[in-house]
Amino acid sequence: MARTPQEVLKWIQDENIKIIDLKFIDTPGIWQHCSFYYDQLDENSFTEGIPFDGSSIRGWKAINESDMCMVPDPNTATIDPFCKEPTLSMICSIKEPRTGEWYNRDPRTIAAKAVEYLRGTGIADTVYFGPEAEFFLFDDIRFGQTENSSYYFADSVEGRWNTGREEEGGNLGYKPGYKQGYFPVAPTDTAQDIRTEMLLTMAGLCVPIEKHHHEVASGGQNELGIKFDKLVNSADNLMIYKYVIKNVAKKYGKTVTFMPKPIFNDNGSGMHVHQSLWKDGQPLFAGDKYAGFSQMGLWYIGGILKHAPALLAFTNPTTNSYKRLVPGFEAPVNLAYSQGNRSASVRIPLSGGNPKAKRLEFRCPDATSNPYLAFAAMLCAGIDGIKNQIDPGEPLDVDIYDLSPEELAKIPSTPGSLEAALEALEKDHEFLTGTGVFSPDFVESWIEYKLDNEVNPMRLRPHPYEFSLYYDC
């Protein structure tokens, strides 16, 4: 909701609000926050920001240059529904106090730069993003890693693996089968009321909502639908989405993960991302080409497909991401596009004759991504496709999963690991850095952070399944 700083300050006064909670996102994509007494906020705070120590924020400044400023966005002001005392919450971007410039490693700033870059090209003045983030709702999660042990244990009342266990009141047996959890009614769907509360809570926070439903996997996989929005707003909405879902779940004694593949041998959780460009209030992806798409829209797809291996370093940025991107679990592993074909990595959804509904859906991403970085990177790839008129090739209007190995060999595939995606980004990042949206320093630090904190530590540790394979060697 559009608000001025003066309106926010008046709201604080009128409602006698004493606590102001300022949220911002770190580089990997986790919200951080600090709460202030109300008198610490004035009109100057909305331009100059409020100082804080950024030395402990992942991927940011070293301790000797750590002073940063949180600049709250008044348009994001809401009352936090999970605080005992009335608390006004705002989402912030980050400034460098020494220079007064926006911080080039702040993901929200990078997202805003992507929109500025789009407008500067003259191609379009607005880009809409619509993420569809899936998640698992568990009743119990335990995990640990020491020098001589490694384990995890995830459990759900809906888990098919629990059909034979003793339960309080008796095991009633309503547990969806593997890959059979899509759209069941109660009592098989145990999360109806929880999802409804999640959805209505988001509506109260001005997130545009659509629907909710059970997803395909057993063990409590769910999805809530929120409407598309402008790039930065959509990323803000996704962070609110995750915040609300986790906190409502906790209220019910449950826990949520957006990990792409927490359960073996069942569907993983993705985050399909719908995208469209507009100019002067008119949609630019509607036309007379394939699937009612415009030539510009096809070039945008060409940019996504060309840069997809590098893009996945931002859209699928964890080692767990690549356990989802495997054949057989409705995950798009082949880089192709199609109308209505959900086995392609880029889909043009069937939208009837409504030009305003023309959009593409990139199906590779997952919700471990930082949405500000992922959306900005996808937009840069699409713009590169338009500027360089990148041909996406012929559409693939067959089920990719039914093709022979010889036919599949002709179709490019997604990277098989986070390390491979980072290697692709190292070789192909001009479409990001050449725009001024991503700085070379940021791309370099992202690769370094992911290798040092995720790829290499995973490589060093024995995996429990290795003991099943090799212990008696």
Swiss-Prot record:
Keyword terms: ATP-binding, Cytoplasm, Ligase, Magnesium, Manganese, Metal-binding, Nucleotide-binding, Phosphoprotein
Q: What GO CC annotations are associated with the protein?
A: cytoplasm; membrane
Q: Which SUPFAM superfamilies match?
A: Glutamine synthetase, N-terminal domain (SSF54368), Glutamine synthetase/guanido kinase (SSF55931)
- What activates or inhibits this protein? Inhibited by ADP (90%), AMP (80%), alanine (52%) and aspartate (41%). The activity of this enzyme could be controlled by adenylation under conditions of abundant glutamine.
Entries under SMART domains matching the protein? Gln-synt_C
Quick one: which residues bind Mg(2+) 2? E134, E215, E223
Which phenotype arises from disrupting this gene? Cells lacking this gene are able to grow with nitrate as the sole nitrogen source, but are unable to grow in ammonium-containing medium. This mutant is impaired in the regulation of the nitrate assimilation system.
Q: Which PROSITE patterns match?
A: GLNA_1 (PS00180), GLNA_ATP (PS00181), GS_BETA_GRASP (PS51986), GS_CATALYTIC (PS51987)
Please give the superkingdom of this protein's source: Bacteria
The record's listing under InterPro entries reads: Gln_synt_N, Gln_synt_N_sf, Gln_synth/guanido_kin_cat_dom, Gln_synth_cat_dom, Gln_synth_gly_rich_site, Gln_synth_I, Gln_synth_N_conserv_site
Q: Which cofactor does it need?
A: Mg(2+)
Which residues bind ATP per the record? E210, H274, Q275, S276, R342, R347, K356
Q: Where is the GS beta-grasp domain?
A: 15-100
In this chain, Mn(2+) is annotated as bound at: E132, E361
User: What is the pH dependence?
Assistant: Optimum pH is 7.2.
Catalytic activity reported: L-glutamate + NH4(+) + ATP = L-glutamine + ADP + phosphate + H(+)
The record's function comment reads:
Involved in nitrogen metabolism via ammonium assimilation. Catalyzes the ATP-dependent biosynthesis of glutamine from glutamate and ammonia.
Name of protein = Glutamine synthetase
Gene source species? Synechocystis sp. (strain ATCC 27184 / PCC 6803 / Kazusa)
Q: Which gene encodes it?
A: glnA
